[in-house]
Amino acid sequence: MKFGNIFSYQPPGESHKEVMDRFVRLGVASEELNFDTYWLEHHFTEFGLTGNLFVACANLLGRTTKLNVGTMIVLPTAHPARQMEDLLLLDQMSKGRFNFGVVRGYHKDFRVFGVTMEDSRAITEDFHTMIMDGTKTGLHTDGKNIEFPDVNVYPEAYLEKIPTCMTAESATTTWLAERGLPMVLSWIITTSEKKAQMELYNAVRDSGYSEEYIKNVDHSMTLICSVDEDGKKAEDVREFLGNWYDSYVNATNIFSESNQTRGYDYHKGQKDFVLQGHTNTKRRVDYSNDLNPVGTPEKCIEIQRDIDATGITNITLGFEANGSEEEIIASMKRFMQVAPFLKDPK
């Protein structure tokens, strides 16, 4: 079982300088506590201050020796050759510790960078295929979404296969399964829904991949985590989650104009699926707490054993809800004490 974490949220009252300083220190602490991967995301929001993920990854990879560092890149917002140069350089200089993670993005991403949001799925899939194939054959395009001359991008890859993953709903799950690529499952869906997503992936996986290959596809799951002997203190993450949800809604606009965006069914689904009909932050937070390892070690172990049922052995955790830097690190330490109770279903 592998464990990673994700950071860079700006809590109310903290400056960007404080967030960035803490972000770097928690990256170093993650390696010291034997976490596997440290993830970064970018959304033009308070919950993703690391605007240039490749630069932030370079900083953390340079400060560590074992920690893997990964992105949640919005692929359509930059030229694939530019992004491929960045990922190849990080792959070489870190000796294979970089993970090229991909997300679809929100309205602000596309409006600021001048990309049509309705075409984002097709562009994401095209750019991802182009970049991953290009690490072996050189970069070329069929001209459907972008035009440029064929080019060899340097340096060559350090790893034979650069680690990659993508956040997924049903259409993306099918696309990833057809290619034998790993998906990232959300922290805001139930265990039964995660199992259903895995079953969908497995149902469409017959694309020339062996059973052994599919068995070892490294899917990951995201969770909010707060482990404390004092169950009441752990429940205090509700205030943090309330602020997070509010910034999420403000950033994505998923409850208004995104609902009318052609080809963006995922955002439409978020309104009904994520909120489950709830219209206030408190009820959304209650819903989230019930799905995630928040509470005493015993409660967290119970929730984590449900995770085993999905067959996923790569877990990404959000610890920032625990408060100060010291409290975050304390909860990270307590989690690593709980972690052995997670079995490896493989």
UniProtKB/Swiss-Prot annotation:
It catalyses: a long-chain fatty aldehyde + FMNH2 + O2 = a long-chain fatty acid + hnu + FMN + H2O + 2 H(+). One of its GO terms (cellular component) is cytosol. Keywords: Flavoprotein, FMN, Luminescence, Monooxygenase, Oxidoreductase, Photoprotein. One of its GO terms (biological process) is bioluminescence. InterPro entries: Bact_Lucif_Oxidored, Bacterial_luciferase_CS, Luciferase-like_dom, Luciferase-like_sf, Luciferase_bac/NFP. Its EC number is 1.14.14.3. Heterodimer of an alpha and a beta chain. This is Alkanal monooxygenase alpha chain.
